[in-house]
Amino acid sequence: MYKIQLLSCIALTLALVANGAPTSSSTGNTMKEVKSLLLDLQLLLEKVKNPENLKLSRMHTFNFYVPKVNSTELKHLKCLLEELKLLEEVLNLAPSKNLNLREIKDSMDNIKRIVLELQGSETTFTCEYDNATVKAAEFLNKWITFCQSIYSTMT
């Protein structure tokens, strides 16, 4: 009698694990990754706001899109990746001897790596962007707020 219930429970567990559902052991890693992402976004914001770097002035005139809905799930990080690619193109971050640009490129590469790890196998999500655009600093601030929100729900 209990055999059917046990088999059903095992099948459900396997289905959840196969579909990338978070398990309790991965929650700690996810928290660390979200915290790292938050710190990298804050570092990138500091570098972007640095008035000494003239090449960044171009970026301050560029408009970025933010998701239409209030982002509350890790799958929304796909939207960050899409816009981060545009930021990289705006900065034209080819190998540079400029220390600030290299640090920005390193931060962006690290952010992309962390986002890909956090997304896992989720590829079906499509970003819906708001019609209004924001400047680079506000764009980064919105994603910092997103990470803080995600992190606070995990603790």
UniProtKB/Swiss-Prot annotation:
Keyword flag Disulfide bond: yes
BP GO terms, sorted: adaptive immune response
A molecular-function term among this protein's GO annotations: interleukin-2 receptor binding
PROSITE patterns (UniProt xref): INTERLEUKIN_2 (PS00424)
Coiled-coil positions: none
Functional summary from the UniProt entry: Cytokine produced by activated CD4-positive helper T-cells and to a lesser extend activated CD8-positive T-cells and natural killer (NK) cells that plays pivotal roles in the immune response and tolerance. Binds to a receptor complex composed of either the high-affinity trimeric IL-2R (IL2RA/CD25, IL2RB/CD122 and IL2RG/CD132) or the low-affinity dimeric IL-2R (IL2RB and IL2RG). Interaction with the receptor leads to oligomerization and conformation changes in the IL-2R subunits resulting in downstream signaling starting with phosphorylation of JAK1 and JAK3.
Protein name as annotated: Interleukin-2
Organism the protein comes from: Moschus berezovskii
